[in-house]
């Protein structure tokens, strides 16, 4: 990937990366992103679920939504994903920070127009969300597919940024505690379930995701 003025990280550039392998790792760990776009000079940021493969990130929504009009017009958008890893508590409040990994993707949306393309997206997305779910749920019918718009953005313009490690101390006061509080996302047991018996693919998903660090 060629780094340009848009993708280049300027603040703490030593934390930046343009390695696609790291981008895909962050995307694989996440479920939601924030999409920034502009309508007649007014900026908006919308949280959305996503699916990705090695080449594209996919977004979907109601055909009635304002953001879908922007997508369909082919206007440029940016997509951000944040993975928090810990709270960094320094001796001086001004030096407090967070450990994180983040990615920002730039591009123009392309619409998936046929039912076959949409159905393929839905099938891949649901098994990416919870592996094994596709075989344990009903795929959308003709009317349901008409009620969703699907777009993709190529993963060829992006930047990744990561902070890790301990505090960057300026103050040396020995009586003040400093350190990092690690932060992890954990999945709990299902609620509002249609049955008291939890399917094996759901159990495996919870166990696998909770084993990630």
Language-model features, listed with the residues they occupy:
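Anion-coordinating catalytic cores for phosphoryl-, nucleotidyl-, and glycosidic chemistry
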Residues: 1-3, 12-16, 20, 24-25, ...
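Short, charged/polar surface micro-motifs in flexible loops or helix N-caps
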Residues: 42, 50-58, 63-65, 76, ...
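C-terminal edge-of-domain segments
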Residues: 1-4, 117-213
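An N-terminal domain-cap segment
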Residues: 3-58
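Residues in well-ordered beta-strands of folded domains
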Residues: 36, 51, 60, 80-82, ...
């Amino acid at each position: 990937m060629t780094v340009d003025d848009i993708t280049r990280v300027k603040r703490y550039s030593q934390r930046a990366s343009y390695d696609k392998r790291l981008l895909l790792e962050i995307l694989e760990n996440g479920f939601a992103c924030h999409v920034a776009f502009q309508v007649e000079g007014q900026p908006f940021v919308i949280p959305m679920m996503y699916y990705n493969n090695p080449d594209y990130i996919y977004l979907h929504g109601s055909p009635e939504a304002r953001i879908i009009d922007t997508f369909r017009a082919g206007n440029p958008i940016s997509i951000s994903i944040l993975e928090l890893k810990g709270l960094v508590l320094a001796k001086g409040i001004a030096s407090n920070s967070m450990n994180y990994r983040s990615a920002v993707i730039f591009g123009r949306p392309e619409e998936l127009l046929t039912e076959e393309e949409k159905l393929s997206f839905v099938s891949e997305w649901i098994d990416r969300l919870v592996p094994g779910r596709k075989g344990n749920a009903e795929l959308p019918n003709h009317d349901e597919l008409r009620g969703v718009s699907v777009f993709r953005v190529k993963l060829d313009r992006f930047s990744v940024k990561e902070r890790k490690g301990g505090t960057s101390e300026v103050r040396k006061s020995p009586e003040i505690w400093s350190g990092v509080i690690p932060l992890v996302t954990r999945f709990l047991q299902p609620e509002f379930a249609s049955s008291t018996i939890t399917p094996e693919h759901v159990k495996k998903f919870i166990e696998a995701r909770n084993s990630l660090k």
